[in-house]
Amino acid sequence: MAARNIGIQVKAPEVECDDKNCPFHGNLPVRGQSFVGVVVSDKPHKTVIIKREVVKYIKKYERYERRTTKLAAHNPPCIHARVGDIVRVMECRPISKTKAFVVVEKLGRIDEVKGEE
């Protein structure tokens, strides 16, 4: 079965899977928000915990602060993201109580990015 077009410009995974909640090989539609984060945990089954940093301006102090947000995202077997991977996640329908996002692309490793500094 070929990977279907999910509506955004991402590279489809080479490996096929039989997960019904995969946006490429199943029938999970994606819509809404899309952002990049780092995988901090992959212990739950078919789930990864993503950490995302946001820089917010504090008007009173005329400074910026760094805020972090963690959220759970579905990890299809064809993408198979691991701890330390930089991934793109996209919003989808609620898959479980805490999961309403799905990993659509692996962008690299955090070690490779930090090694260039």
Curated annotation (Swiss-Prot):
The biological process GO terms on file are: translation
Gene Ontology terms for molecular function: rRNA binding; structural constituent of ribosome
Q: Name one Pfam family in it.
A: Ribosomal_S17
Q: Where are the transmembrane segments?
A: none
Q: Which domain of life is it from?
A: Archaea
Which SUPFAM superfamilies does the entry link to?
Nucleic acid-binding proteins
Decide whether keyword Ribonucleoprotein is in the record. yes
InterPro entries annotated for this entry?
NA-bd_OB-fold (IPR012340), Ribosomal_uS17 (IPR000266), Ribosomal_uS17_arc/euk (IPR028333), Ribosomal_uS17_archaeal (IPR019978), Ribosomal_uS17_CS (IPR019979)
Query: Could you tell me the keywords of this UniProt record?
Result: Ribonucleoprotein, Ribosomal protein, RNA-binding, rRNA-binding
> What GO terms fall under cellular component here?
cytosolic small ribosomal subunit
What Gene3D superfamilies would the database entry show? 2.40.50.1000
What is this protein for, i.e. what is its function? One of the primary rRNA binding proteins, it binds specifically to the 5'-end of 16S ribosomal RNA.
Q: How does it assemble?
A: Part of the 30S ribosomal subunit.
Q: Which family does it belong to?
A: Belongs to the universal ribosomal protein uS17 family.
Q: What is this protein called?
A: Small ribosomal subunit protein uS17
Give the organism, scientific name.
Methanocaldococcus jannaschii (strain ATCC 43067 / DSM 2661 / JAL-1 / JCM 10045 / NBRC 100440)
Q: Which gene encodes it?
A: rps17
